[in-house]
Amino acid sequence: MSSGAETRGRKKSWLGKVVSDSMDKGIVVAVERRVQHPVYKKYFKKTTRLMAHDENNEAGVGDLVRITECRPLSKNKSCRLVEIVEKAK
């Protein structure tokens, strides 16, 4: 029997903007994606808000960040901050 680590896929990662950093060691990231309407075929934006773990409280509101999925860290938090791509001005 093969080990479970070989059969698992890659973890998802998202690029988004920090919309809240008021939690201790936590941030809320808004991730935008383009979705096509099933009937009218027009593209529009949908926003998903994900809570992520920020161990050092280094991300601020307006920063562009990369987050990745991980094991559940709390009721709503199952992502980690990987890097800050661009700091807010």
UniProtKB/Swiss-Prot annotation:
Pfam families: Ribosomal_S17. SUPFAM superfamilies: Nucleic acid-binding proteins (SSF50249). Disulfide bonds: none annotated. One of its GO terms (biological process) is translation. GO terms for cellular component: cytosolic small ribosomal subunit. GO terms for molecular function: rRNA binding; structural constituent of ribosome. The keyword Zinc does not apply. Keywords: Ribonucleoprotein, Ribosomal protein, RNA-binding, rRNA-binding. Belongs to the universal ribosomal protein uS17 family. Part of the 30S ribosomal subunit. One of the primary rRNA binding proteins, it binds specifically to the 5'-end of 16S ribosomal RNA. PANTHER family: 40S RIBOSOMAL PROTEIN S11 FAMILY MEMBER, SMALL RIBOSOMAL SUBUNIT PROTEIN US17M. This is Small ribosomal subunit protein uS17. It comes from Chlorobaculum tepidum (strain ATCC 49652 / DSM 12025 / NBRC 103806 / TLS) (Chlorobium tepidum). The lineage of its organism: Bacteria, Pseudomonadati, Chlorobiota, Chlorobiia, Chlorobiales.
